[in-house]
Every structure is written in C-alpha cells, then in structure tokens.
Amino acid sequence: MQKKNPKYDYGIHLTLTCEWEKHRFGPVLPLSEVPSLVDENGHFFKKREQLHKHASSAEIEKEMKAQIDLAIQYGLQPSHIDSHMYSVASSPAIFKVYKELENKYHIPVLISKNLYKNTGYDFINSIHETDLTLEQIHMGTFKDFESGKLWEFYENALQNLEEGINLILTHPAFDDDEMKSITINHPNFGSKWRKIDYDFFTSNRCKALLKENEIELVDWRDLKI
C-alpha cells in the first residue's frame, strides 16, 4: 500500500492490549519471551488495568521493538508511532520505554497529556516539560456516538480548531460482515462508529469545512525529528 501511495502517513500502532471478544491476538514474539504480557490463552489482556498489574516493562520493551522491527522488515517506512488504547500510559516505566523509541528509531511518537489522562492514570511522572506533546486532540466520545451526534462532533471540531497543530483521531472502516465480527458486542468504536468516521472524512461536507476554515492538512513527516 505504501509503495502505491507513498504520499500518505503510515504509522505503527503499537499494540499491547486486545479488547475484542472473538478477534483475539497476542504478541509477535514467542510467548516464552513475553509471558507477562498475555493471559492463560496466550492473548493480550483486554484492559489497561490488567497490563498495568501483570506486565514487565522489560518484556514490553522487547515486544514494542519487535513490532517496529517487523514492520520495517516488511518494507514499511513509518512516519510515526502511536499506541492502541494508549496502553503505553499504563505505568511510568512503560511510558518511559515508549518515549525512548523516538530516539532509537528516529521516528516521532505520539505524546499527549490529554490522552494520558483519558486512560485514568496520572502523567505527572511520565511527561516532562522538555517532551514535545500534542494537546489539541479531538476524538468523538461514547456519548457523541450513542446520541447519534458523532457526525455533528466532527463538524464542530473542524469549525472550532485552535491555531497550531490539531490532531483528529478517527477509526474509519466499513460496516461490513468482517468489521461486525471483529467488533461484536462492542458498539463503541464498533463497525457503525467506524463507518460514520469513513463517511464523514470522505464527504464533500468535510472538504468544504476544510476550505471554509482555511485548515491546512499536514502529516507526521512535517513534524519529523
């Protein structure tokens, strides 16, 4: 995909948890190398709290590096690194390892006090004044989706962006059998939600709002260290 469309961002979504009911998966490393990261079935834990309780930061470091190395081995030239469920915020030790990946691989990592706070953990010992952070982050809430106002949220976000760098987090996909199966019993961030994301950000309405509000689209390569 990157070879055919090199102008787009292709990041690595580091994954240490798996919330899905039927679409279960685990680490890329052998289980014997990272036993603290998995449940009795060899799958990642469903919740950040479980990761916080059981995971070894040394094993997390090994797994995160393995995921990045594997992606690069497959030919990906990553524009940035972020984290599924922002599970890297599960502890200061884990977050320290995550931040160090930026210097090791010379790839920007997503650091945000707001995302950290959303996990329920305190960032005070993890994010420092010298860290480059992105705080103008916009993401629809469960309430927006459940009240049928997710589309409206995105419209309002584009109409009220603050000056500077803004990041809108979305999960675009089709509301098809595959996505319904993956997200079964998980309506929040489920297939219907993802289809709304896809529909809005490919719509003429979105394009018009970008133009009307003089929003310049940038990518992670513009922020590359």
Residue locations for each model-derived region?
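Terminal accessory/targeting
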Residues: M1-Y8, T15-L76, H80, S90-I225
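Conserved short loop/turn motifs at secondary-structure junctions
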Residues: H84-S87
